[in-house]
Amino acid sequence: MGIQKRVLNFLHDKINAKNRERLNNATPTLICSNCAGGFIYHWLGLQFRSPFINLFLTPEDFVKALENFDEFIDTPIQEVKDSGKDYPVGVGALGIKIYFMHYKSFAEAIEKWNERKQRIDKNNMGVMLSNYAGGGTSC
């Protein structure tokens, strides 16, 4: 590993350690339109308390999911066959598509979605919408 990479890793670790010390809320539910929430949980050393990990929704679908949150979360996700993607895609309430881009199979994605969905604390939520890459399609 080169010196630049070592310095960046050192600084990253120091910043994360300082942020963990300053953290007052150890159980947030982060609802993010892309992978950002997973990074935040990881950097702070927190348990994933949200199903919105390793996936993305388009900004339009993300807003629709938030506007109808209970219905969206409580409706089973169905697999989209022949999505044209090389990763699993699901569709939930109101036709909202979920792109499970960091999962190998739909079964794995749904298992994690349902497991983490049980940890949601609706009284301790933070929401983050990203329009990175023109549609939230990159993590």
Cite the ranges covered by each PLM segment.
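Extracellular glycan-modifying ectodomains
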Residues: 2-139
